[in-house]
Amino acid sequence: MIELFSADGWLNQAIVSVNYFTWTYILVAGLVICALWFTWRTRFVQFRMIGEMVRLLGDSTGTHDEGEKHVSSFQAFAVSIASRVGTGNLAGVATAIAIGGPGAVFWMWVIALLGSATAFIESTLAQLYKRRHADSFIGGPAYYILHGMHCKWMAKLFAVLITMTFCMAYISIQSNTICGAMQKAFSIDPTWMGGALAILSLAIVFGGIQRIAKVSSVLVPMMAVSYVLLALVIIVMNIQLIPHVFRLIVENAFGFEQVAGGGLGATMMNGIKRGLFSNEAGEGSAPNIAATASTTHPVKQGLIQSLGVFTDTLLVCSCTAFIIIISGLYVNNSESGILLTQVALESEVGAAGPIFIAIAIFFFAFSSIIGNYYYGEANVRFLTQKPSAILALRVITGGVMVMFGAIASLDLVWSIGDFFMALITICNLVAILTLGKYAFRLLDDYRQQKRAGVKSPIFKRETMPDIEKDIECWGQ
């Protein structure tokens, strides 16, 4: 059984073959084309309105009935960042550099800069088509596919795929990374670590979205700031190498300096793959939490989630990239993933490096497990309201898949993640390309209100009479 889960097992080899075709011939082109279109059509919203994005983090929740529990704009931002800022930032970046060289970082930056416009579109649509659920809101791609495109089978397909992606594949990756880091730093057996992690995960996921939001809003800023500060210290210590680092990134990005992974193709492919895993722009994940926010206009969450892409890739991912490239250990090194990040940091700060990374990755990846679970729960609730289904999801997510990630090989869990990531992204891109025109109209409405002097724009569904019947919220 363990051999089946190994890097050389037939399961991993089969998935790798499928991933190569899907990513090479479909997904990379689709992501770039969509990102360029949304960037152009929104008139570069991700750059022109970055000041508004930051201001909206302090935006108060929209008006609601007394006793209702709604997620604030900042909490929605924190939960989505909790999912984005995780293994992809420490282990994913290291894997991309190990295979594609420093140039992979350039393509991660590109997909983040352009993809933030895609993130704006999907999260704005999630807010537009959100539904009331108990004392909060619920929504996401499954909901805008059903109520916007009126395509029931596609909505159900997406709900199933994203649940499998985040609650199975991605949580396995987070667990695998935590266990690997803890084994290197503290010699803790992965099986024991997996068991402890499962207990902690179950305790959180049984608490519901309000507990998830509260935990994430505390953990995420703390872990992100501490990691960025350490990276800045290392960069300052090696300030004379920074021009060389940028030169390596640019030269390798365009194939001027070949790498073991196969030159320009491997560099671009791995940069885009790991960039998407990290920032989730266009993947259809962040809209699930964006829909839960109580706000006065759908565009507000679109802008906030766009900022999340910048924060994830341009800040946190870049920190890992600079640490690894400065160390030079990505060249002819047998280590990959989180272990490469650990040895790179060890070369800069000594034996404390692997220990710090082990602790950091625990908080990064554990918060991602929390965020990933919510994405799954939101979509299971779309499929069925049976309490037994939610109970099963919590047990499988917090128990079974955490343990699977602890014992499976690094290559297998990443291959499975890439496979499901491709499927949900293709499905979501089709949806947002179809419905994007409504996000454009919402953005125009928001800008017009701002130009008219309205400090906090308000959206009413009657301003879009052609689709008013499809919108449940946003009434009087």
Locate each region found by the language model.
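Transmembrane helix-loop junctions in multi-pass membrane proteins
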Residues: 10, 41-46, 88-93, 102, ...
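Membrane-interface loop-to-helix entry segments
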Residues: 30-54, 176-182, 189-238, 242-250, ...
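N-terminal alpha-helical transmembrane segments of multi-pass membrane transport
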Residues: 1-87, 98-103, 433-476
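Helix-loop-helix module between adjacent transmembrane segments
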Residues: 34-39, 111-135, 141-176, 180-205, ...
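Alpha-helical membrane segments and immediately flanking helix-loop junctions
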Residues: 64-97, 125-128, 134-142, 146, ...
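Extracellular loop-to-transmembrane helix junctions
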Residues: 16-55, 98-135, 311-319, 419-429
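Flexible loop linkers connecting adjacent transmembrane helices
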Residues: 44-71, 95-105, 117-149, 330-348, ...
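Extracellular/periplasmic helix-exit of transmembrane alpha-helices
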Residues: 120-129, 134, 232-248, 256, ...
